[in-house]
UniProtKB/Swiss-Prot annotation:
It comes from Xenopus laevis (African clawed frog). Transmembrane segments: none annotated. The keyword Kinase does not apply. This is Outer dense fiber protein 2. Belongs to the ODF2 family. It is found in: Cytoplasm, Cytoskeleton, Microtubule organizing center, Centrosome; Cell projection, Cilium; Cytoplasm, Cytoskeleton, Microtubule organizing center, Centrosome, Centriole; Cytoplasm, Cytoskeleton, Spindle pole. It comes from the Eukaryota.
Length: 649
C-alpha cells in the first residue's frame, strides 16, 4: 500500500442538488521549494502530494441497532476522502452546485494567474525600460545639438584658419618689407660711412678750394701788380718817349710775367670751376640723400605703425586661438561624453535586445500555456458534464439503496429478537449492497481509468469497502448513539459545506475576475507585442542613427585631431615668428636708436656745411666777379699790348 505511486487528480461529477463534502489530506512535510513549484507549473495538471497513510477511525455500530436513516456513503483513499450525505429536505436550498465545485486545478490556475500577474509586473517594469529608451532618445537629440555645435565650431575654425592665413600673408609681406628696410638701412649705413668720407673729402676740397682761391687771389694780385707795373712802364715810356734796351727788356720780361700769371690764373680758374661743379654736384647729392633720409624715416614710422597694428592683430589672433582651443577642449569633452553615451546606448541596446528576446520567448510560452489552458478548460467542462451525469445516476441508485436500507433497519429494529434471520437478511442485503457497491466501484474504476489511471486505487477502495461492510455488522448496535453524533457531525459538516460553498462562490468570482484579467492581460500582451514590434523598428532605426552618429563622431574626431595638430603647428609657427619678430624688432630698434643718435648730429653738421657752402658760394660769386673783372682787364691789357706791339713795330 505504501509503495504505490501517488494517486492522480480526482474528477467528480455531482448533481447540483446533492451536497458534497471533500476532505483532502495534506502531508505533514514542509511546503515544497521553489524548484518543486516550478516543476508543478511546468506540468500544468500535476499530481497531488501524497499525505501520510493514516486511516481515520469510523465509529463502531453494533449489529441490529443501526438505523440507516440519514446515513451517507463514505469513501477514503490514500490521499482523498469522500463523504456523500443524502439531501436534506430542510437544507435543500443550501446544497452545493456545479459552479461551487473547487478542485486543485483551480489552485493551479490561481498560481498560474499569480505568475501571469508577476509577468505583467515584469512587463510594466519593461515599460519603464521603454521610458528609459525615450530618455535615451532625448540624449540622442542632445547629441545632435552637440554635433551642430561642433559643425558651427568647425566653421569658426575654418574662418579663423582663413584669418590666420591672411595674417600669415601679412606677416610674410611685413617680413619682406623688413628685409627691404634692413637692406635700405644697410645702404644708409654704407652711405653714412660714405657721407663721413664725403665730409672728410668736402673738408679737404674746402681746404683745397680755399687754397685755390688764395692762389687765385695771389695770382690776381700779382697779375694786378704786373698790370700796374706795365701801366706804369707804359706811362713812363709815354712821358719819356724813348725806349732803351733795358726798357725793352723790362717790357718783354713784364710781358712774359704777365702771360705766366695769366696762364696760372686761367689754370686756377679752371680748377675752381671744376671744384665748384663738383661741389654743386655734391650738394645736389646731399639734398637727394636728405630727401631719401626723410623718405626712409617716413617708411620707418609707417613700418612701426604697421608693426604695432600687426602686433595688435597677432594679439587678437592669439586670443581667438585661445578661445578656439578652449572650444576644442569643450568639444573634446563633448565628444568624450558622446562616446560614453554611445557606449551606454550600445549596452542598453544589448540589454533591451536581450529583454526583447526573453519577452518574446515568454510571450510565446504564455500564448502556448493559454492555449493549453483553454483546451484543458474545454476538456474539463466536458468531463464535468459527464461526471455530473454519472453523479445523478449514482444519486438515484444511492437514494434507492438508502430507502431499502431504511426499510431493512426498521425491520431489524422491530425484529431484534430474531437477530439471526435478520443477520442473514442483512448479509444478503449486504451482499446485494456489495454487488451494487462493486458495480459502483466498477463505474468509479472506469471513471478513474479515464482520468489519469485510477485503477490502482480501485482495488484499495474495494478492500476498504469490504472492511467497511464488515465494520457495519459490528456498528449496528451503536447506531443510536452514532446517529446523534452523526447529526452533530452532519451539522458541522453542513456548516463546513456552507463555508466551502461561500469559499467556492468567492473562488468562482475570483475565477471570473481572473478570466476578465486574462482578457485584459491578453489585450495588454497584444498591445505589448505591437509595442515590441514598434520598439524593434525604432531600435533598428536607432541602430542606423547610432552607426551614422558613430561615423560622424569618428570624422569629427579626426577633423578635430587634424585641427588641433594644425593649431599646434600654427602656435609653434606663431611663437617662432613672434620670437623672430621680437629679435628683429629689438635689433631694428637698436640700429635705429644708434642711427638716430648718429643722425641727431647731422642737422648741425648740415647746417654748418650749408653755411660754409653759402659762404663759399658768396666767395665764388665774388671771385667770379673778380675773375670777370680781371678777364676784362686782361682782355683790355691784351688789346693794349697788341696795339702797343703794332705801334712798336
Amino acid at each position: 500500500m505504501k509503495n504505490r505511486s501517488p494517486s492522480p487528480p480526482l474528477h467528480v461529477h455531482v448533481d447540483e442538488s446533492t451536497p458534497v463534502h471533500v476532505h483532502i489530506k495534506k502531508s505533514s512535510r514542509p511546503p515544497a521549494k521553489t524548484q518543486q513549484g516550478a516543476k508543478l507549473k511546468k506540468k500544468g495538471m500535476g499530481n497531488l502530494r501524497r499525505s501520510a497513510t493514516v486511516k481515520t477511525k469510523v465509529p463502531w455500530i453494533p449489529p441490529g441497532k443501526s438505523s440507516l436513516r440519514d446515513a451517507g456513503l463514505k469513501w477514503e483513499g490514500l490521499t482523498h476522502r469522500l463523504d456523500i450525505t443524502p439531501p436534506d429536505t430542510e437544507r435543500m436550498f443550501s446544497a452545493l452546485r456545479m459552479s461551487d465545485l473547487s478542485t486543485d486545478e483551480e489552485e493551479m490556475k490561481r498560481s498560474k494567474m499569480n505568475s501571469y500577474e508577476e509577468k505583467i509586473a515584469t512587463l510594466m517594469s519593461e515599460m519603464g525600460t521603454l521610458k528609459h529608451e525615450l530618455e535615451l532618445q532625448k540624449r540622442e537629440k542632445y547629441l545632435g545639438k552637440c554635433e551642430e555645435q561642433l559643425a558651427a565650431s568647425k566653421r569658426l575654425l575654418e574662418a579663423q584658419q582663413e584669418e590666420l592665413a591672411e595674417v600669415s600673408q601679412e606677416l610674410v609681406e611685413t617680413e619682406n618689407e623688413n628685409v627691404w628696410l634692413k637692406r635700405s638701412l644697410d645702404r644708409i649705413q654704407e652711405e653714412k660711412g660714405l657721407s663721413i668720407l664725403q665730409k672728410q673729402q668736402l673738408q679737404e676740397e674746402k681746404a683745397h678750394l680755399l687754397a685755390k682761391l688764395l692762389e687765385a687771389e695771389t695770382d690776381g694780385a700779382e697779375a694786378a701788380k704786373q698790370v700796374t707795373l706795365l701801366s706804369d712802364t707804359i706811362q713812363r715810356l709815354k712821358h719819356e718817349k724813348r725806349m732803351t734796351s733795358t726798357d725793352i727788356n723790362l717790357l718783354t720780361r713784364q710781358k712774359e710775367l704777365l702771360l705766366q700769371k695769366l696762364n696760372t690764373f686761367e689754370d686756377t680758374n679752371r680748377s675752381l670751376r671744376t671744384l665748384l661743379r663738383e661741389q654743386h654736384r655734391q650738394e645736389t647729392e646731399t639734398y637727394r640723400l636728405m630727401e631719401q633720409k626723410e623718405m626712409l624715416l617716413k617708411k620707418l614710422s609707417d613700418a612701426d605703425t604697421e608693426k604695432m597694428h600687426l602686433q595688435l592683430k597677432l594679439h587678437e589672433q592669439e586670443e581667438k586661438v585661445e578661445d578656439l582651443l578652449a572650444q576644442l577642449k569643450t568639444e573634446k569633452d563633448l565628444s568624450k561624453t558622446a562616446s560614453e553615451v554611445s557606449k551606454s546606448i550600445e549596452s542598453t541596446k544589448a540589454h533591451l535586445q536581450g529583454q526583447l528576446r526573453t519577452r518574446e520567448a515568454e510571450n510565446n510560452r504564455l500564448s502556448v500555456q493559454i492555449r493549453n489552458l483553454e483546451r484543458n478548460e474545454a476538456h474539463q467542462k466536458e468531463e464535468i458534464v459527464k461526471l455530473m451525469e454519472q453523479l445523478t445516476e449514482l444519486k438515484q441508485k444511492v437514494d434507492s439503496e438508502k430507502e431499502a436500507l431504511k426499510k431493512s433497519v426498521r425491520a431489524q429494529k422491530q425484529r431484534a429478537e430474531r437477530s439471526e434471520e435478520t443477520l442473514e437478511m442483512l448479509n444478503r442485503q449486504l451482499v446485494g449492497n456489495d454487488s451494487e457497491l462493486a458495480k459502483a466501484l466498477s463505474s468509479a474504476e472506469t471513471w478513474r481509468s479515464r482520468y489519469n489511471k485510477l485503477m490502482k486505487e480501485s482495488s484499495q477502495h474495494e478492500e476498504e469497502v469490504a472492511v467497511l461492510s464488515n465494520r457495519l455488522k459490528g456498528l449496528l448496535g451503536e447506531s443510536h448513539g452514532i446517529e446523534e453524533r452523526g447529526r452533530l457531525e452532519r451539522d458541522s459538516l453542513l456548516e463546513k459545506l456552507h463555508q466551502q460553498t461561500t469559499e467556492n462562490t468567492c473562488l468562482r468570482l475570483e475565477h471570473e475576475k481572473l478570466k476578465a484579467s486574462l482578457t485584459t492581460v491578453e489585450e495588454k500582451l497584444s498591445l505589448a507585442q505591437s509595442e515590441v514590434q514598434q520598439l524593434k523598428n525604432s531600435l533598428r532605426q536607432y541602430e542606423g542613427l547610432v552607426d551614422t552618429y558613430k561615423e560622424q563622431l569618428q570624422k569629427s574626431r579626426q577633423e578635430a585631431n587634424s585641427i588641433s595638430l594644425q593649431l599646434e603647428m600654427s602656435e609653434k609657427e606663431n611663437k617662432n615668428i613672434k620670437e623672430d619678430m621680437n629679435l628683429e624688432l629689438e635689433q631694428m630698434r637698436r640700429k635705429f636708436q644708434n642711427r638716430l643718435s648718429e643722425l641727431e648730429h647731422l642737422p648741425e653738421i648740415l647746417k654748418s656745411t650749408e653755411l660754409d657752402l653759402q659762404e663759399c658760394h658768396q666767395q665764388l660769386r665774388s671771385y667770379e666777379q673778380k675773375s670777370s673783372e680781371l678777364s676784362s682787364t686782361i682782355s683790355d691789357l691784351r688789346t693794349r699790348v697788341r696795339n702797343w706791339r703794332n705801334c712798336a713795330l
